[in-house]
Amino acid sequence: MKRKKAIAAVMCAVLAVSVSGCSPRKEGTNAPETEKQTGGGQQTESAQRNQETEDSGTKDTEAAEAEQADQTGRTGNSGEDPNTADYEYVQPAGERFDIASYYNELGVDCSFKLRSTGGVVNVPDNYTTELPVPKEKYTVGFSVYYTVDEVGAMILDTMKACAEEAGIELLVNDADYDQDAQNQAIEQWILQDVDGVILAPCDFTGVKESLDSLKKAGIPVITFNPALVSEADSVVMSECKEQGVMAGELLRKYLEDNGTELKGTIVYQSLPFVHPNAATRSDGFKSVFADCPDLDIVELTGTSIEEHYAAFESALMAYPDMIGAFGLYSAATVGMLNAKAANGSGIPITSIDNDKPILQGIYEGNILGSACYSSTAPAFWAMSGMINLLNGVDIPSAYFYENQLVTKENVEEMFEHYYGGKKLKDYMAGEIQ
């Protein structure tokens, strides 16, 4: 599946050009259109931006490689990346992603740095390349923030499957949103002298201890979702502001199509701690309603389905002028969905994430739609990146995976896409879990 959406317009600022230089906005997203880099013919706007960046002298590949070698004891560019055929370059090989500027432009305080200089790429869900072949037997630690929801559980299952396929010894830590537990696991892996670590942070500033220790030990690290502090070799991430915009535009279109005045209250449910994905998703969602002065957007928080249920049930009573709701992640959406049903509410809900109850809610008309992404493809890209890195390849400093808008029109197709060919109707009938 060809990537239909590229990294958000804020990337233009990161690439040292003005926002006005971005491609025209597509309906349903704030992202510019990009094309695969080609060997000849007319330059795309992306290629022109990349050339401007190269010409400006802001990046020095040799200096970057020297710095990387100094920081980790490794050198890049010692081999070709076997996954290149699946990459859509947003920033060319030879450069590193200035992720701190990317997040600062979105209003998130970030000092995180990336060491790899293999550019920035969009990667597909339906990849055509295979896992790289390890040059030797590698031991890799994988710490996942938690596996309570389907996203975390599927990430872990896919990571295990990829490790088994590639012959990687995988050490696993399910941190259950406990940063101290995650730090302790990393400390133990450092003592074991693992070859590399893939890390999905619990606390995006509290993870500094682990990342600093890994750097000091010279152990390569790829983060699954970005940290906000310290540094790593590379990051596998989504363009979360785009997700928020997709969810917001879907809700706004529904309200306008049904003659609802854009006044009153919209509630959205988020997390009670700093999370870069949450901050950028909420920013994207709220930007859709920035021209609605009579509309209040109220944040509610929680970390479980039960907490989000209680918060939404209270909000239904506290805000009689509520016209819509947004679940920023799966537990928030499912909690609101359950509270909506229990209270006989007709409030339209829009969402991010593709857990099975959310897709069922879309099919049944209880959720307008959801900005979704694969929980399996990112694990493949993280493991591929780690193997390539350990093999001596200068990997991309950022892998951006696909966002897809799922509505009632395509929910059955997308259920099969996200769940390995399984059928939504079989899930609803209780024939599959």
Q: What is the predicted role of each segment?
A:
Residues 144, 159, 247-292, 297-299, ...:
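An alpha-beta-alpha
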Residues 1-20:
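Sec-dependent bacterial lipoprotein signal peptides
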Residues 191, 199-216, 285, 301-361:
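Hydrophobic alpha-helical
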Residues 19-31, 40:
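Bacterial lipoprotein signal-peptidase II cleavage site
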Residues 127, 134, 236-264, 280, ...:
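Hydrophobic alpha-helical segments within soluble ligand-binding/sensing domains
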